Amino acid sequence: MSQLPEIIRTIDRVSADVVAKAATFQAAILSDVAGRRGTMHGRVAPVHQNMKVAGPAFTVEVRPGDNVMIHAAIALAQPGDVLVIDGKGDQTAALMGTLMLSACKKRGLAGVIVDAAIRDKLEILELDFPVFSAGFNPAGPTKYVPGRINHPISAGGATVNPGDLVVGDADGVVVIEREKAPAMMALADKKVADEAARIESIARGDTAAKWLPAALRAAGVLKEGETL
């Protein structure tokens, strides 16, 4: 049985420099260079497509439909943190709404990611604060079931450890392990440059994917010597 407390107050966070650099990349770029791992299920999406978030994960695990631990997490999280909540994908009640999210913004959090329903969509759109969720439900939550703060969680099918790098945009959310995040930044720079060069070649009329014939042969679709 774990001897760790249910609430862990002190965590190691991905550095501010890495967060600032990561914020310049699309989530898709970071997902590619991280080996196409760590992306959350598409159900976890921004309330508005223009919302973006980047920062260290401050993790919360709750029982479906109960938000007492989220209130505790808001009180403990530091400016720049991204609240990442494992709500088990539950859609039967909203875990957060305008009041709690306004408190998150006031405390300087970078954003909130909830693998569960939230509510007050129209007000959130006016809040100018990045929020990602698995859906919406007008029903409110209960506030008495214990949970955990800053333990490893699963949100949207992705493993999230406290302090990991979290980046979200219109495409969804990607999580990169804190220890690996710095090395991913140079790879992301190269990926962006490579894609820009490819877009330029497409604009010149070179639309052929050079790798495709070999891939089709390896898959057994094309015979040796056969071309498209």
Label each region the model flagged.
Residues 2-162, 176-228:
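Feature captures the catalytic cores and cofactor-binding loops of soluble hydro-lyases/lyases
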Residues 166:
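C-terminal binding/interaction regions
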Residues 169:
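Histidine- and aromatic-rich ligand-binding microenvironments
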